[in-house]
Amino acid sequence: RSSADRGQTWNATEQMLFEHEGGWTIDVPDFYRSNGLPVFISDHNADSPHYGNLYLNWAIEDEETGRTAVLFSKSEDDGESWSLPVQVHKDSSQYNHFLTWMTVDPSNGNLHFVYYRKSRNAKTTDVVWASSKNGGASFNEEVISEQSFEPSGTVFFGDYLNIAAVDNVVRPVWPRMDNGKITLWTALINFE
């Protein structure tokens, strides 16, 4: 549903955007729980080259292969139509990508993402930051965890990672596990 008056009234029409493979429950080996929770944001800076764009980011699990992926779609017409979903990360059958979060830098419209990348053949897990300077037309990604960690399938990590950005200062936050102990981390990213 949509509103043209800042939420005072809503149209009666609902629109299904995409089939959500895996839905809320995504099975990633060695993680107690993961989810495909969609993240929805808008670029609300009138000076941004992408002003008014709506962005959607979520994770899926392929029912046949069990592979997970982080997807992205955008609308440039107030949600009337949406781009076909694309992967934020490089295509790779050797990794699962999951537990994503996204933000838009209100000062310039740059998009930033954080998500886990876990080997499909081992417990080895890293944290990845991805960014887009062109409204999601393309993405750059970088592993930001200083070293890989190995999760335990018996310990609950939480349901979310998070990321904030303003004036090209980007701060993702995530939990990791070392020797059975969960700690919270961030990266100090100054984006140019």
Language-model-detected regions and their locations in the chain:
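Extracellular, repeat-based ectodomains that mediate carbohydrate processing or recognition
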Residues: 1-192
